[in-house]
Amino acid sequence: KSIPFFINGEAQVVESFKDQSKWIRHDLWVETSFDSDDDGKMDRMHVSVTRPSQTDNGLKLPVVYETSPYYAGTAGIASGLFWDVKHELGEKPKPRKHVEVTRTGKRPIISNSQIKTWVPRGYIVVHSSSPGTGLSDGAPTVGGKNESMAPKAVIDWLNGRAKGYNLREGGEEEIAFWSTGKVGMIGTSYNGTLPLAAATTGVEGLEAIIPIAPNTSYYHYYRSNGLVRSPGGYLGEDIDVLYDYIHSGKEENRARNNKVVRDTEMINGMDRIKGDYNEFWESRDYLNQMKPMKAALLMAHGFNDWNVMPEHSYRIYKKAMEMGIPTQIYYHQDGHGGPPPLKMMNRWFTRYLFGVENKVEKDPNTWIVRENDSQKNPTPYKSYPNPDASLVSLSLQPGGQEKGGLSLKKNKIKKLERLTDDYSFDGATLAKAKNSVHRLLYLSPVLKQDIHLSGVSKLTIRVASSKRAANLSVWLVSLPWNSDRKAKITENIITRGWADIQNYKSLNESSDLIPDKFYTMSFDLQPDDQVIKKGQQIGLMIFSSDQEFTLHPKPGTILTVDLNSTLLKLPIVGGLKSFNKATR
């Protein structure tokens, strides 16, 4: 008999579900509760279904669901699509070009993702195109409410609470008679954001989600502590650029969508001039919307993801744990993307979609891939950050243009050190330089044994700028720098952070700096979990413009750092005792 079966709490491949030629593939449109393109009709989402043929004969199965704005094609990286970053902070940038997306993709197949993994194991796989993309109605809003309500409507349809039709307009009703109503969502990057968006609606039937490298707040994606800061690899990208990039929906709706969403709501709300956190960004931060959420959460992220940075998953994981939601996090040491091992995902969906009591909720809630291990072999921990980690406060010792020190002892005499901004030097060049006027570098003693960092490093800095605004960039590095092309991603940069000194009081409000006046600002660097090997030195590098991430103002701004009032706090497993052992 063709039914799902389980070994060791995992759904197994069912021989009769493996034959792709017997899979039933069809598409339809699910009617939502909103009209985001203002055409007077409720938006319908384009949905496709892939299911074993046995579901036509009474077999009901749970659903693995992925939704995306990317399925029907994107704008590509056209010249002039991104904002020009070569201008002073606080200045209006030059206008950028807008690009039209040529829609691709044919009915009935929206995507082939997930199907080979999950259909043979007894799941139905469902895909849908986000509002204003592909053959879905509506407007893309990049984090707006309709991007949460669209997958909610699809889940409602899978539970018999919303209507589906065989045509985009009118048509005959389609019923999900093959669905048990239990749904799990999965996806990477934007496709990982949308499961979280759906979960924040509290929709019944969404039992579990696996967001991989999800963008959980568009402010944290395009800004950093008040600073206009691009996601890694996409210098000059902003929320309106992403809107253009994904807008593959109905051509006749595009002019209206552009005017209302991109050229009004986004341009008025995103504030590329000041970079402050405001109502626009607040409404696109899923941390603020988690109260109704109940779906069991398995998150995955790379500690060296400089596109969607590791804080995106950490902040949601932390809140979900506080809320008592079943939660696990899988962190690896690589860059953007990278799912948990299939065994972890299978156990998660088996428990929450099939209801098999496999005790996954009693597993450790933190899994971290160690530096030399494969992504399939994470190490379990009680929680993240490591419960044995505590913050160790380090003061800056003079000599930063060459190599200053990081020490437990404070300076006895007041000491100021200066750097001159010049974006033409990238961070790696500055970190490797024996001396430079363009950065300040402070090193720990050479480590006599490994140091395990786990959690969030924090910097309090007292700094003055020669101009009314300046970039502030901070890298935590492991030196000597390994310049070998085969060097691992973990070997040089430990973590990074960026801030706008104008936001020293708050993220919501910035004010021009008085040149040469000192301001004190505290901010977090990106979360990390990394073992720094003996023989290395931990270095704090302070500089101004970060060539890969920030605006590129004219070189010459001088930052002066007051060493006595600047403090780096490192989350060290074993705390002060471990630091002393490694450095004395």
Which residues fall in each region the model found?
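Short beta-strand/loop motif that positions the catalytic acidic residue
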Residues: 293, 299-301, 305
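Catalytic histidine neighborhood in serine/cysteine hydrolases
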Residues: 321-337
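C-terminal, loop-rich substrate-recognition/catalytic regions characterized by aromatic stacking residues
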Residues: 330, 339-584
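Conserved alpha/beta-hydrolase
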Residues: 119-135
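Conserved alpha/beta-hydrolase "acid-adjacent" motif
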Residues: 306-312
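Accessory cap/linker subdomain of secreted extracellular hydrolases
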Residues: 73-79, 83-104, 108-116, 120, ...
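Catalytic nucleophile-loop/oxyanion-hole region of alpha/beta-hydrolase
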Residues: 105-108, 134-153, 162-165, 335-341
